[in-house]
């Protein structure tokens, strides 16, 4: 009984190590694709984009009412970017935006976004997207130290107008913010 228990543990650990090796082998390939997509979006943009922040919403279940009553949820600001659609119909974008944060202080953000895009209707202009953004932001309450961000993206669009959004996870009274903006392609 003891021997079979140790054999089972050995095989479990061995399989995990093989899996980790495959993940790291694929990580190089993934990082190469990531860099190539950023470079192609920078060097060969199809569109230039105007970003207009629309709403921030602090999840009420994750905040004291006194805090949410004081927070800014109208993120005035704007941004500019460039983007392209790849051969699979997925969206790639490089952007820079500045907006008023929860404390009504300016917050810049710049980065790369990618969304897998679906066109579920007969009208090809309507599109839905799910993906991520990776970039850098800086906040007043962190003395504008550059902070890396990796966040989910989702969107609903028609033609050149897209309502794009993310969710910033967090803890109680911190993070847990829905942030959305309009993106217009030219």
From Swiss-Prot:
* Pfam families, alphabetized: PagP (PF07017)
The enzyme's first-digit EC class, named in words, is transferase
Per the Swiss-Prot or TrEMBL record, the active site comprises 58, 101-102
- UniProt cross-references to Gene3D superfamilies, sorted A to Z: 2.40.160.20
Q: Does the keyword Transferase apply?
A: yes
Q: Where is this site: Role in lipopolysaccharide recognition?
A: 67
UniProt GO BP: lipid A biosynthetic process
Catalysed reaction equations from the record: lipid A (E. coli) + a 1-hexadecanoyl-2-acyl-sn-glycero-3-phosphocholine = hepta-acyl lipid A (E. coli) + a 2-acyl-sn-glycero-3-phosphocholine; lipid IIA + a 1-hexadecanoyl-2-acyl-sn-glycero-3-phosphocholine = lipid IIB + a 2-acyl-sn-glycero-3-phosphocholine; lipid IVA (E. coli) + a 1-hexadecanoyl-2-acyl-sn-glycero-3-phosphocholine = lipid IVB (E. coli) + a 2-acyl-sn-glycero-3-phosphocholine
Q: Which domain of life is it from?
A: Bacteria
Q: Provide the protein's localization.
A: Cell outer membrane
Give EC number(s), comma-separated.
2.3.1.251
| Signal peptide region | 1-25
The record's family statement is: Belongs to the lipid A palmitoyltransferase family.
What is its biological role? Answer: Transfers a palmitate residue from the sn-1 position of a phospholipid to the N-linked hydroxymyristate on the proximal unit of lipid A or its precursors.
Subunit structure, briefly?
A: Homodimer.
Instruction: Write down what this protein is called.
Output: Lipid A palmitoyltransferase PagP
The encoding gene is: pagP
